[in-house]
């Protein structure tokens, strides 16, 4: 007998811990889950339950990620924590765990370290919109001035990467004390303050169904007597029969009208985010549409060829290249449903990129693709994945 239906009455938000190795990300993750479970229900987690993160695959890349859930009075959170630095890089670039906000953990005893900076930069590049800071290990620092200094350094670092340093909530505490059940200011109280900061500082994300209509084209059929049907999975928004849509990417943008929505051989009056549908397009010929284009609300997304991106290059062990690549390397870029050839320009100080590296690059595609900042892609050579990336900034 089922124990009743899962009621999701609270809005859902995805978060994750970022920060330097050994600054206390996993301890904090355990502390949040444990403290909040006593207040709002949910499951307490021990450190080693989170640290033994299972492997998962995203875009052919193996990533170790721990998933923890917890609730506050207002929200349900899904929280990701990664054991190793390389896992963070892969996770953020592939979007395996898309974050609505990140919790930056920084040790008060050490201050910002190289990975603190690198994770903030990655968060900026991959479009993590909000960061909340937990200044950890405050029980090891007696000097108030030292705490203020570390706090100031963190705010400056956030500013440097275009996060609002002055407005960012910084909570002081000790994840270790909280996990041990300490009820003091640095223990449980700090975790409750952090939970409040997450609730108030990170806005509730827009649900996919509330977005502007977008559907990547997977297949195109000609049905005699009815016209052209385009199939795919609606990525966001809603499409209603009779609405005007645009076909964007690869060639010149065209306008058409959706005259029918089909799902499982039934006619519907609309399709929405998550649905696998066939859309009947008025006056559109079979050869006017191809896989790799998108159908969208007119004016909502534009085709582009020139952009900067943050990419992770697969190591040899992950089935990637065995050799480095150099400036002007020309692989295929797999966006949504299709490959497009493009040329890579490396930063001036980078002569080559080794398998296992992550790097900021500039790309020029030979055909335009419907593109927005934050769009994920794979880098492929002859059909096998050699890298993963995310569009950081559109140039043209």
From Swiss-Prot:
It comes from the Bacteria. Residues 19-26 are annotated as: G1. InterPro entries: EF-Tu_GTP-bd, EF-Tu_GTPase, EFTu-like_2, EFTU_2, G_TR_CS, P-loop_NTPase, Small_GTP-bd, T_Tr_GTP-bd_dom. This is Elongation factor Tu. The keyword Nucleotide-binding applies. Residues 60-64 are annotated as: G2. Belongs to the TRAFAC class translation factor GTPase superfamily. Classic translation factor GTPase family. EF-Tu/EF-1A subfamily. Its EC number is 3.6.5.3. Monomer. Disulfide bonds: none annotated. It is found in: Cytoplasm. It catalyses: GTP + H2O = GDP + phosphate + H(+). GTP binds at residues 19-26, 81-85, 136-139. The gene is tuf1. Keywords: Cytoplasm, Elongation factor, GTP-binding, Hydrolase, Magnesium, Metal-binding, Nucleotide-binding, Protein biosynthesis. It comes from Verminephrobacter eiseniae (strain EF01-2). One of its GO terms (molecular function) is GTP binding. Residues 10-206 form the tr-type G domain. Signal peptide: none annotated. GTP hydrolase that promotes the GTP-dependent binding of aminoacyl-tRNA to the A-site of ribosomes during protein biosynthesis.
